[in-house]
Design a protein with these regions (language model features):
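N-terminal auxiliary segments of SAM/dcSAM-dependent transferases
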Residues: 23-110
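Conserved class I S-adenosyl-L-methionine
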Residues: 153-163
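Conserved SAM-binding loop of SAM-dependent methyltransferases across substrates and taxa
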Residues: 164-176
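Conserved SAM-binding motif I beta-strand of class I
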Residues: 179-184
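Conserved SAM/SAH-binding beta-strand->alpha-helix loop
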Residues: 186-188
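A short acidic, Gly/Pro-enriched loop at the edge of an enzyme's catalytic core
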Residues: 214-224
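A short glycine-rich, Lys/Arg-flanked "PGG" loop and its adjoining helix->strand segment in the class I
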Residues: 238-249
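Conserved beta-strand signature within the Rossmann-like core of class I S-adenosyl-L-methionine
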Residues: 251-258
Length: 314
């Protein structure tokens, strides 16, 4: 993990970065305080080009008004990435996640306000643009889910496990007719996502609910998003069956899972995308499209690396 998500040690020239003032400010903060990540921005710009830069610039501009705010966010990202790296190194040795219950993970992470607002959520937010497999998943989301939603007459959607609000923002920003509901069990996630969507100017079309949809089922919707929730659960299939009931007849869902990705709150270990597919099938979903991306190349043959797996299902 160190060689791709955090410990970049060589700085590459970034011609044209001056076209994006916030990215320039972010790079300045990184060079000054977080030199181990100095090539993240340049590498992503080289890989994904102007579209990535435009999108990241828009997000940064709406949420972080000055370098001090960017530095605070980058501090959260650094802590998030370092913690992830430590867990991944341990996983590479044991090939298992530490044994923990959902209640233990929830208490340590989701209901830990200081950790969520200072590290976890800012780190996760920036990772959508600084980690290649996270951004590639956003691209797949745009193509395989957002595009058909944009053509649909009924643009109502729900997101279960809203987290930072990145995916909801993506839909609301590109579709003025879209309206959404967000569900999360973490008060901090609800707060962060609400503030994020307000800063983006789209909160008027999105209602956030602090609600466990297993204990209190949600109303079915034609379009449903659930990003990286399954690995946080003890019984993903039971949760997927609840999600299946939340998708209206003829509706579609975008469901993802993190594979071989050790984090403090990851409980269920998916080793490959086929295991997720089997769980989706067991819950009654039909897989229409799928996508898998690796975080980085393995350090040696057979060493597991984090993967992002996404599915469009009906």
């Amino acid at each position: 993990m160190a060689n791709a998500l955090l410990m970049q040690t060589s700085s590459k020239p970034m011609p044209g970065l001056q076209s994006w003032p916030q990215l320039c400010r972010l790079q300045s903060v990184i060079e000054r305080r977080f030199a181990f990540s100095r090539s993240l921005v340049g590498r992503a710009l080289d890989t994904f080009g102007a579209q990535w830069a435009d999108e990241f610039e828009t997000l940064l501009s709406s949420l972080f008004e000055d370098e001090a705010a960017l530095e605070t966010a980058m501090k959260g990202y650094s802590a998030f990435a370092m913690d992830s790296m430590r867990h991944q190194r341990a996983f590479e040795k044991t090939r298992e996640y530490p044994n923990k219950t959902y209640a233990e993970a929830a208490q340590a992470v989701y209901f830990n306000e200081a950790h969520m607002l200072r590290e976890y959520l800012p780190g996760l937010l920036l990772s959508h643009f600084l980690w290649p497999h996270h951004y590639r998943q956003l691209q797949f989301f745009d193509m395989a889910f957002a595009a058909p939603l944009a053509r649909a007459a009924d643009k109502r959607f729900a997101e279960v496990g809203v987290g930072t609000g990145v995916y909801a923002r993506r839909l609301l920003s590109c579709m003025p007719q879209a309206h959404g509901l967000g569900y999360d069990i973490s008060p901090s996630s609800c707060q962060f996502a609400t503030q994020h969507l307000a800063a983006a100017g789209v909160s008027g079309r999105f209602a956030m609910r602090l609600q466990d949809i297993v204990a209190q089922p949600m109303e079915p919707v034609p379009w449903l998003v659930c990003v990286e929730v399954l690995e946080h659960l003890e019984d993903p299939v039971a949760f997927l069956r609840v999600l299946r009931q939340a998708v209206a007849p003829s509706g579609k869902a975008f469901i993802t899972a993190a594979l071989n990705a050790a984090h403090a709150d990851h409980i269920y270990l998916y080793r490959n995308a086929q295991e997720v597919w089997q769980h989706l099938d067991a819950a009654g979903f039909h897989v229409e499209q799928s996508f898998v991306a690796a975080a980085y190349a393995p350090s040696a043959p057979g060493v597991p690396v984090p993967l992002a797996a996404a599915f469009v299902v009906s």
